[in-house]
Design a protein with these regions (language model features):
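Hydrophobic transmembrane alpha-helices and immediately adjacent juxtamembrane helices
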Residues: 1-258
Length: 258
């Protein structure tokens, strides 16, 4: 942890070298989800409900997903840009260092500008929690926390898959963005509105529904089964096959010679 904090300090100092550029980039990141949220707002000006969900419930859903994604994107950016590390030979240096490869890639890049999305998500989450009639109890508080943390782990797993694919393609594959940016965009609404097929895929293949749809149903009072609180914890198991795929890629890595 001490070494990680040292890396974080280095990245902060690097970002602060050009403060105006950093603040403008963070501001731009703030407006990206804001425009998406306006789209949701305009739709609810025309339709009062979507698949039985109100504006505040959808806003709560979007805020939780956006916060998870923004934190994962901020701290796991090294895996999202891993194809560059492969291409320029930087990963060769990682392999000869006496630290775990995942840890070193994790520390290689942190896009602190992405905290702009996180700020927007926090404001939206506070507003949604104030306006959504939730019958609060300890289990629902833990559900909210687990949804955010589980979402971070889930997005981190997808980034690991992306990085693992880079060992075999040498370049990133754009289709993986369906599982990162796509999950963030689809996360604006509860997954049930996309149909049974999507909900099934996001339950058993990529367990996105376990950190979004099912615990959300308990959080907003659609049912009172407190076991839904544990679903985001179960979804965290997804990181295990993702890590194994990454290790498989490391074992088959061949240097580019750069």
């Amino acid at each position: 942890m001490k070494l990680y904090l040292e890396f974080l300090s280095i990245h902060i100092k690097k970002a602060m070298q050009y403060k105006a550029s950093f603040l403008l980039s963070a501001l731009a990141q703030l407006f990206i989800p804001l425009t998406c949220f306006w789209g949701v707002q305009f739709m609810f000006m025309r339709f009062k409900q979507v698949d039985g969900f109100t504006y505040t419930e959808v806003s709560l859903c979007y805020a939780i997903v956006l916060l998870s994604f923004s934190l994962a994107e901020l701290f796991f950016r090294g895996f999202d840009t891993f194809d560059r590390m492969i291409g320029n030979g930087e990963f060769d240096r990682v392999l000869v260092r006496p630290r775990n490869e995942v840890f070193l890639v994790l520390c290689s890049r942190m896009d602190l500008e992405r905290f702009g999305k996180g700020i927007m998500a926090i404001f939206l989450l506070i507003w949604a929690l104030q306006n959504c009639p939730i019958d609060w109890c300890a289990a629902r508080v833990m559900t909210l926390i687990f949804m955010i943390l589980g979402g971070i782990v889930l997005f981190a797993g997808v980034y690991l898959i992306f990085a693992g694919l880079c060992f075999f393609t040498l370049e990133g594959l754009e289709f993986i963005n369906i599982l990162t940016d796509g999950m963030r965009e689809h996360g604006r609404y509860p997954l049930s509105i996309y149909g049974k097929g999507v909900l099934t895929f996001c339950t058993y293949i990529v367990p996105y529904a376990l950190v979004q749809y099912y615990p959300l149903m308990y959080l907003i009072g659609r049912h009172n089964d407190a076991r839904a609180m544990l679903l985001p914890v179960i979804a965290c198991v997804f990181i295990v096959p993702c890590y194994l795929f990454w290790k498989f890629g490391v074992r088959h890595y061949r240097s580019t010679g750069s």
